[in-house]
Amino acid sequence: VELTGTPSSNGLIDLWAQIYLLDGGERLGKTIGQYRERFFDPDKRNRTTIFSYAPKDGSLEYIQKAIGDICISMKSEDYLEMPERIYDEVPVVLDAPAAKAYKQLERELLLETDEGMITAGTAGVLTGKLLQLCNGAVYDSDRHALAIHQCKIEAFLEVLEQLNGQHALVFYNFQHDRDRLLAALEPLGLRVRVYQNTADEDAWNAGEIDVLMAHPASCAYGLNLQNGGHHIIWFGLVWSLEQYEQANKRLHRQGQKHPVVIHHLVVQGGMDEDVITALQRKGDTQEALMAALKARIKKAKEGAS
């Protein structure tokens, strides 16, 4: 028996390993290479490297049918009383200097500041640089954070003010995000912590923390934070659908007494918008997969009765 909360966390490409453990490659192929060649075409790539794959026409339907006899799908919403989830997209408009710097880096893969030089030699590195720049600072080659703008910090503080004292779980992506957020929060007199261990979990649930900051990778699994608040603020988004969904489930889980509001700070025209789109696209893929397998629940229940 194999259990997973996100069967295709980053799209259908992730399914092969899980199904291979169940059937030894009978349904989707003996190797990941065979699986990719049969069901996917290269998507984003350069001359030497393939960064991602896109399903061929009909692949989703074939895969669903192929694994339907050994998989059943159950969502927590189907058997638990779950609170409502509300998504709030907060647009962040870069000021003129920040927008100019962003466009320059995107166009030339090179950004010069008075404090040093930052290079982005590959698409993957460029993506990271642009996400950093959306957030307001960028690491140089020596891992020094160069501050570029305060636009997203200001938007974050506005959202926090609108919460009117309600507690917030804040997810950041880069260490310089955390450091700049801490500096911005310091004058406000709020009880702020960066999540490190169960002592922080206990203090949050006891109502002793106004703002709990965390990287989604550090608390995406196993933490029960539903008693400490019902607002999530994504200061810096991540590409991983699994990390994103699991992080949101720290508050959106059984025992939460309020609707969970998930605020996304999204730089207009920036890489943030691409991340939101990618998360939504992967989510749609996963929802389609889960829906198609749902019929197995009914069949399994009928077989057990």
Can you name each region flagged by the protein language model?
Residues 169-171, 179-219:
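Conserved helicase ATPase core of P-loop NTP-dependent helicases/translocases
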Residues 36, 91-92, 131, 167-174, ...:
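Short beta-strand segments
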